[in-house]
C-alpha cells in the first residue's frame, strides 16, 4: 500500500475523531442549555400564582374588579394548560434531536423554548402584578368602607348615648342618620352592579355627611344646655330675686321688667324651635343675644342693690352733715357781721356766704325730707343715690368755701395789729435813716435819695391815715402795709449805697493826689469827680469817674478800698 493512501486513511480517521469530539462537546453544551430551560420552566411553574389567585378570590370581588380577576385567572389557566405543555413538548423534542446529533434542529428547538419561556415569564409577571393591584385596591376600598362604617356606627352610638342632650334637634338628627344609611345602601347596590366610580362617589358623600353630622352633634348639646337649662335657671333666679326686691321696697327706673322676662322666654322657645334646622351659627348668635338681655337684667338688679347700700349710708349722713354746714354758716355770718362794724370788708365774703345759705336752703327743701324718710321712698335707690351724692358734694363744696372765707376774715384783726406795729417800726426807722444821713456831713443829699425818702414818708402817712378811720378798709391796710415794707427796705439800701459812694469817693480823691502831678488823666478825672461830688452831689458818678482813672494807673486799687470799707462800715442802729 502506498504511503499516500496510508496518509489519506490517517487523515480520514483524524477527521472522524475530531468530528466525534466536536459532536460530543456540542451535545453536552445543548444538554446544559436544555437542563437550564427545564429549570426555568420548573421555577416559573413553581411560582405561588395559584396561592395568590386563591387569596384574591377569597376577597369576594364584585363588579369591574371581579371581571378583571376572571380575565387574569383565565390567562393563568391558559399558561398552565397550553404554554407549559407546549414548552414541555419542545424540550422533549430538543433532547431527542440532541441525542441523535441533530444539532441544528436541536438548537432551533432550544431557541424556541427560550423565547416561549421569556413570553411566559412576562405573562406571569403581568398576572402577578395585576393580582397584587386587585388585592391592594380591594383592601383600600375595604378600608374606606370600613372606616366610613366605623364613623357611622360611632356616631350612631354617640347619639344614642346622649339622646337627651339634643332636645328638639333629635327628629332632624334621626332624619339625617337615615339619609346616610340610605347612601350606604346605595353604595352597596352600585358596587354590586359593577359601577365602582358612582359607588365611590356615593361612599364619599356618605362619609362627608357622617363627619359633618358628627361635628354638628358635638356642638348641639352646649347650645341645647343653654336653652333648656342655663337660661331657664337664670330667668328663675332673676324672677325670684325681682319679687324679693319688690317685697323689700325696691323700685326700678325700668317699668317693663315683667315684659322683658316674657320676651326672653319667648326668645328661648323660638330659638329652640329654630334649632331643628341645625343652623348652629344662627342659634349661637341668638343665644349670645339672649345672654346679653339676661345680663342686662342682672345689671339692673345689682345696680339697685349696690345703690341701696350707698343711699342708705348717705341718708343717715346727710342730715348731720347739713346741720353741721348750716351751723358753720350761721357762725360765719355772725363773725362777718361783727367785723363789719369795725372794718370795711370785701363784698365777696358776704355774697359768698349768701350763696352758701341758698345752697343749704335748697338741700333742706328738696333732699332733707327724702333722707329722713328714706325707708318710705318710692323712688329707685339709684336715683336716690345720685340725689344724695349730689347734695353731699354741694355741702362739701359749701364747707370748703366756708373754710376759705373763714381763713380770709379770721386774720383781719391780726392784720390791723400787725400793720400798726409795722407802722411804728417804719416811722422809727425813717427817723433813724434821717439821723444816719445827717451824721455823715455830706456836701449835699442826692435828689434820688430825697425823692425816695419823701415818697416813703408819704406812704407811711397814708397807712397811718387808713388806720385812723372809724371803719378800717382792711384790704387797703394790707396793700399799704406791703408798699411801706418794700419802700422802707429800698430806702435803707439806698442810704447805704449813697453813704458808701460818698465815703469811697472822698478816700479815692485823697489817694489820687499821689498821681495827679504826673498823670494828666488822673488830674482831669479828679477835677471832674470833685465837681460831681461837691456841686452836683452825684456821688455815684463821682465814684465811677475817679475809680476808673485810678484803675488805669493802679489796677485793683478800687477793690482794695471797697473791701476795706465793707469791713468797717457803720450800720444804721434801728
Swiss-Prot record:
Source organism (scientific name): Streptococcus pyogenes serotype M2 (strain MGAS10270)
Transmembrane stretches, start-end: 8-26
Record carries keyword Cell membrane: yes
Superkingdom as given in the UniProt entry: Bacteria
High-level lineage: Bacteria, Bacillati, Bacillota, Bacilli, Lactobacillales
Keywords on record: Cell cycle, Cell division, Cell membrane, Coiled coil, Membrane, Septation, Transmembrane, Transmembrane helix
UniProt-listed InterPro entries: EzrA (IPR010379)
Stretches in topological domain Cytoplasmic: 27-574
Full protein name: Septation ring formation regulator EzrA
GO biological process: division septum assembly; septin ring assembly
This protein's GO CC annotations: plasma membrane; septin ring
Protein topology in the membrane: Single-pass membrane protein
Family label: Belongs to the EzrA family.
Keyword Cell membrane among record annotations: yes
Residue intervals on the Extracellular side: 1-7
Coiled coil: 102-141, 274-350, 459-520
Subcellular location as annotated: Cell membrane
Amino acid at each position: 500500500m502506498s504511503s499516500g493512501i496510508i496518509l489519506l486513511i490517517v487523515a480520514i480517521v483524524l477527521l472522524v475523531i475530531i468530528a466525534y469530539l466536536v459532536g460530543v462537546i456540542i451535545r453536552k453544551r445543548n444538554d446544559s442549555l436544555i437542563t437550564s430551560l427545564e429549570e426555568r420552566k420548573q421555577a416559573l411553574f413553581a411560582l405561588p400564582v395559584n396561592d395568590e389567585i386563591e387569596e384574591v378570590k377569597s376577597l369576594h370581588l364584585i363588579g369591574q374588579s371581579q371581571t378583571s380577576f376572571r380575565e387574569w385567572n383565565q390567562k393563568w389557566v391558559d399558561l398552565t394548560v397550553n404554554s407549559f405543555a407546549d414548552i414541555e413538548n419542545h424540550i422533549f423534542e430538543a433532547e431527542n434531536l440532541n441525542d441523535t446529533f441533530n444539532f441544528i434542529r436541536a438548537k432551533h428547538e432550544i431557541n424556541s423554548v427560550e423565547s416561549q419561556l421569556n413570553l411566559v415569564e412576562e405573562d406571569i409577571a403581568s398576572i402577578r402584578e395585576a393580582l397584587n393591584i386587585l388585592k391592594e385596591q380591594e383592601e383600600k376600598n375595604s378600608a374606606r368602607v370600613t372606616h366610613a362604617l366605623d364613623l357611622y356606627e360611632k356616631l350612631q352610638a354617640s347619639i344614642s348615648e346622649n339622646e337627651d342632650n339634643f332636645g328638639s334637634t333629635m327628629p332632624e338628627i334621626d332624619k339625617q342618620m337615615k339619609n346616610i344609611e340610605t347612601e350606604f345602601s346605595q353604595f352597596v347596590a352600585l358596587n354590586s352592579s359593577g359601577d365602582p366610580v358612582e359607588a365611590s362617589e356615593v361612599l364619599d358623600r356618605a362619609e362627608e355627611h357622617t363627619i359633618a353630622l358628627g361635628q354638628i352633634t358635638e356642638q348641639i348639646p352646649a347650645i341645647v344646655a343653654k336653652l333648656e337649662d342655663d337660661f331657664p335657671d337664670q330667668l328663675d333666679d332673676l324672677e325670684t330675686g325681682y319679687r324679693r326686691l319688690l317685697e323689700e321696697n325696691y323700685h326700678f327706673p325700668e317699668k317693663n321688667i315683667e315684659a322683658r322676662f316674657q320676651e326672653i322666654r319667648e326668645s328661648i322657645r323660638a330659638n329652640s324651635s329654630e334649632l331643628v334646622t341645625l343652623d348652629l351659627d344662627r342659634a349661637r348668635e341668638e343665644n349670645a343675644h339672649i345672654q346679653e338681655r339676661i345680663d342686662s337684667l342682672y345689671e339692673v338688679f345689682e345696680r339697685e342693690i349696690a345703690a341701696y347700700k350707698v343711699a342708705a349710708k348717705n341718708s343717715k349722713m346727710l342730715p348731720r352733715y347739713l346741720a353741721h354746714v348750716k351751723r358753720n354758716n350761721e357762725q360765719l355770718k355772725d363773725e362777718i357781721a361783727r367785723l363789719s362794724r369795725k372794718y370795711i370788708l370785701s363784698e365777696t365774703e358776704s355774697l359768698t356766704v349768701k350763696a352758701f345759705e341758698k345752697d343749704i336752703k335748697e338741700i333742706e327743701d328738696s333732699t332733707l325730707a327724702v333722707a329722713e324718710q328714706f325707708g318710705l321712698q318710692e323712688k329707685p335707690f339709684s336715683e336716690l343715690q345720685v340725689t344724695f351724692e349730689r347734695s353731699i358734694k354741694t355741702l362739701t363744696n359749701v364747707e370748703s368755701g366756708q373754710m376759705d372765707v373763714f381763713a380770709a376774715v379770721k386774720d383781719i384783726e391780726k392784720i390791723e395789729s400787725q400793720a400798726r406795729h409795722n407802722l411804728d417800726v417804719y416811722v422809727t426807722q425813717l427817723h433813724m435813716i434821717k439821723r444816719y444821713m445827717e451824721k455823715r456831713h455830706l456836701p449835699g443829699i442826692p435828689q434820688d435819695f430825697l425823692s425816695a425818702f419823701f415818697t416813703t414818708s408819704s406812704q407811711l402817712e397814708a397807712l397811718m391815715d387808713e388806720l385812723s378811720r372809724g371803719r378800717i378798709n382792711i384790704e387797703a391796710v394790707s396793700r399799704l402795709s406791703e408798699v411801706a415794707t418794700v419802700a422802707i427796705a429800698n430806702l435803707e439800701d439806698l442810704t447805704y449805697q449813697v453813704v458808701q459812694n460818698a465815703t469811697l469817693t472822698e478816700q479815692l480823691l485823697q489817694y489820687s493826689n499821689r498821681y495827679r502831678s504826673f498823670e494828666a488823666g488822673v488830674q482831669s478825672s479828679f477835677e471832674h469827680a470833685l465837681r460831681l461830688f461837691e456841686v452836683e452831689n452825684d456821688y455815684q458818678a463821682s465814684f465811677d469817674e475817679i475809680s476808673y482813672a485810678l484803675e488805669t494807673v493802679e489796677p485793683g486799687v478800687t477793690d482794695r478800698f471797697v473791701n476795706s470799707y465793707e469791713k468797717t462800715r457803720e450800720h444804721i442802729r434801728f
